[in-house]
Amino acid sequence: DSVVVCLRPFKQGEIIEVDGKTITLLQDTPAGHKVLIDNAAEGTNILKYGYPIGHAKKDLKQGEWVNENNLKTNLAGTLEYTYNPVEEILNIENENRTFKGYVRKNGEVGVRNEIWVVPTVGCVNGIAEKLVDLLKQETKCEGIDAIHAWHHNFGCSQLSGDHENTRKVLRDICLHPNAGAVLVLSLGCENNQPDEFMKMLGDYDKDRIKLLVTQKVEGDELEEGMKLLRELYAQAKEDKRQEVSVSKLRVGLKCGGSDGFSGITANPLVGEFSDWLVAQGGTSILTEVPEMFGAETILMNRCENKELFDKTVHLINDFKEYFLSHGEPVGENPSPGNKAGGISTLEDKALGCTQKCGRAPVSGVLQYGDRLETTGLNLLSAPGNDLVASTALASAGCQLVLFTTGRGTPFGTFVPTMKISTNSNLYRNKPNWIDFNAGELVEGTEMKDLVRKFIDKIIAVANGEEARNEYNGYREISIFKNGVTL
């Protein structure tokens, strides 16, 4: 590599030893940021994680602080790629671990047993919330884990792709195994017509999913809604947890508010878990396609076959075309918080981001709104936006989401959203946000030891222990939109 990452703040003039070289720091350098190991001429590629993260904007000296002011991305437009398959043997034994989940009629397993109200259109959000309040007051949630309405602004005034995205995500929520029962709540006149929407659910369990079209109710829609919810509650409260194999777990992999520690602590930790889960017969999903730019060839060459490689090429280039069609550069992703935390370019971010999926082969590629069909590691088309991407992961069928963060974030999607801190300061400062601390990895804890604790924590959450977002009541959905609003 061309750089090293500072594990603590360094002052100008301090001396460090790297691979037998004595390096004097030329500037004050914050923790998580990069220092140059050797002189680099203007235009020279700067390597981190063994790959280029950009090139020097000017001549750089040994010991110089490398950041967005002197490092420029190499990313531009779409590319042509060649399939050069790489196979890694994980050598991880199947431990036959189990968790206690809710087994549904179709064989899927939930980690929660909740009652959900799903509006087909934003016009009925208020009614949905009122119904949830009434059912909570009446039942005290006895015998179930929670009652929620999933507000959104869509379902009408949308065309083509946006309209289908909304319908697919709402369908996926209705069919999610974490829901013991669902009330689909419609206005009646929306573009997302209720009868057509219900057909999208396929052969669904009519005792567990019911429809209320409020414009067709003569009189009080709340009274009619409560009648249906009481029927749904009577079904859901009888569900009990059963011992099932961890192979039934489907886990989403996400990062947000990343910093310079993300790629050396939390993301590799999540990657180790992902490999372990895949070895147990389980499933993990990586998304945030724009945050794969610069690391995409690593994923492409891990595809199990040429067909999956071709799908991954489309996954990447289609998102690049989306950026370019709006006149936006493909490499301007890092946020102000990313840069303040030590991430300078999109390649820098991507090479850290993709470590969340470990080394397992890619066994499936999903479009936005698709539901999981293949066990193992899957890639999913969705943007990097935290709320949109996390919702997409859960919609694909993930029962929980692992979310690494260096800056911190409180939000959660409609499934448990576990926050893993990249550094111990965040873990200490925001215990109400953070579920697990990966910062121990730069404080002497061995990866193999922390992975065992991490596996136990995830299984505890799958068994019913609340993630911090659940405890705080921070749960919401966000649907991808890229077209015209009428």
Predicted feature descriptions by range:
Residues D1-L400, R407-P410, V415-L486:
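Metallocofactor- and cofactor-centric catalytic cores in central/energy metabolism, strongly enriched
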